[in-house]
From Swiss-Prot:
This is Ras-related protein Rab-8B. A motif (Switch 1) lies at residues 31-45. The lineage of its organism: Eukaryota, Metazoa, Chordata, Craniata, Vertebrata. The modification Phosphothreonine is found at T72. PANTHER family: LD44762P. One of its GO terms (molecular function) is GTPase activity. Its EC number is 3.6.5.2.
Length: 207
């Protein structure tokens, strides 16, 4: 059976339990929101195929358990991941503080050139906010990572987050193929236009 996609990207959602990783995954993969999700036990994944620059990209998105006792299960899934979303809950200060621990986990277990993005989730709950946008942005700048505030409930910036991460992976792949071509390795490879990587920040805006 012929492949129905040009690229397969493996993405990971990591972060503390209860920050809304599963809700983000379901909003993006099925455009659905459910407040009754129980904490993910172990690992689950969803697939959605998107189009970027005329190429079909199959996104295999893994939802990892945030509880400490599942950390050993999760570490095996870092291998092969091309993009990782670090998710915290803007109404939960501790989940934000733990992002640094999750980044340390990535540095220990993931590929050195994995694309990363920090997401401050539940930005629809502004009245219960404990972490300001500015603090989220500053943390992202400190680590050289892109940042978005999202809401799975209101669908704010969910599409933008996944598309931005996929585009950054695509840009990196194109750059690698260009480098490979220019060094004479392998046969001809068709390259789509590569965009220079920029660190940009998006704000949560509710209409």
């Amino acid at each position: 059976m012929a492949k129905t996609y040009d690229y397969l990207f493996k993405l990971l959602l990591i972060g503390d339990s209860g920050v809304g990783k599963t809700c983000l995954l379901f909003r993006f993969s099925e455009d659905a929101f459910n407040t009754t999700f129980i904490s993910t036990i172990g690992i689950d994944f969803k697939i959605r195929t998107i189009e970027l620059d005329g190429k079909k990209i199959k996104l295999q998105i893994w939802d990892t358990a945030g509880q400490e006792r599942f950390r050993t299960i999760t570490t095996a899934y870092y291998r092969g991941a091309m993009g990782i979303m670090l998710v915290y809950d803007i109404t939960n200060e501790k989940s934000f503080d733990n992002i640094k621990n999750w980044i340390r986990n990535i540095e220990e277990h993931a590929s050195s050139d994995v694309e990363r993005m920090i997401l401050g989730n539940k930005c629809d709950m502004n009245d219960k906010r404990q972490v300001s946008k500015e603090r989220g942005e500053k943390l992202a700048i400190d680590y050289g990572i892109k940042f978005l505030e999202t809401s799975a409930k209101s669908s704010t910036n969910v599409e933008e987050a996944f598309f931005t991460l996929a585009r950054d992976i695509m840009t990196k792949l194109n750059r690698k193929m260009n480098d490979s071509n220019s060094s004479g390795a392998g046969g001809p490879v068709k390259i789509t236009e590569s965009r220079s990587k920029k660190t940009s920040f998006f704000r949560c805006s509710l209409l």
